[in-house]
Amino acid sequence: MTKVLLVGESWVSSATHYKGFDQFGSVTFHLGAEPLVAALKGSDFDLTYMKAHEAAESFPFDMDGLDAWDVVILSDIGSNTFLLPPAVWLRSETVPNRLRLLKAWVGKGGGLLMCGGYFSFQGIDGRARWRRTPVEDALPVTCQPWDDRVEMCEGAVAEVLRADHPVMAGLGGAWPPILGVNEVEAREDAEVLARVPEAQGGHPLLVLGRHGQGRTAAWTSDIGPHWLSPAFCAWEGYGRLWRNLLGWLAARG
């Protein structure tokens, strides 16, 4: 079994409800990775889902911890969660820099995937802050210095540029629409397998690369709503896309 660690894709929201003179508050916990979890169930990929609030203290602080995994997925989680665990934020203690650790782990053969979202790449208002980090060094793309969201409310159907690539196997025909991406720049030595149509900006959607002995990838849209339409999540190619991509990332060398 290929061991995959998915980090992020959860959040907490609070709301105030007004009913005439009266009001009350509510708090809701949300999960964003359920389509991917369902798609990998019963497959050759053993997925562990580390929620965003757990990652501050539970994401490994040493190489032995990372070596338990073949592929790490960062999805909709900002760099501050890794840089400001409670030991640093509350007690001003020093801890290993997990962004540097992750880069080194990829360099010696680990597989790394960053998926898009409001707190991926540079993110909403630039708050994800992955630009100019060691993790960006390992990715096949570079982040913009600004709010990098590209909202496409009209929908965009991906243009597949490398239908012959193993990651694209079994994914023929038109893909269902996506509703947005993070704007990135593909590195010169990277492979852009799919992009947004040129008329909608031509932004990279799926990019592959290598860092040292490891393989890396960037998927610049969501892994579920809201940037992935319900049709995309229900598409028979949805699970195949992720299985193909994770299989490629897990292959060493």
What does each model-found stretch correspond to?
Residues 15-28, 81-94, 123-129, 231-234:
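Short, flexible/disordered intra-domain loops and linkers
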Residues 4-6, 11, 65-124, 210-219:
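Short alpha-beta junction capping motif
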Residues 2-7, 111, 191, 201-203, ...:
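Extracellular ligand-binding/catalytic regions of CAZymes and related secreted enzymes
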Residues 1-75, 118-122, 230, 243-247:
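Aromatic-Pro/Gly-enriched surface loop or interdomain linker
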Residues 1-2, 9-18, 33, 111-200:
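An acidic, glycine-rich "communication" segment
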Residues 57-63, 100, 201-205:
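Alpha-helical scaffolding within the catalytic cores
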Residues 41, 106-107, 117, 140, ...:
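Sec-exported extracytoplasmic/periplasmic mature domains
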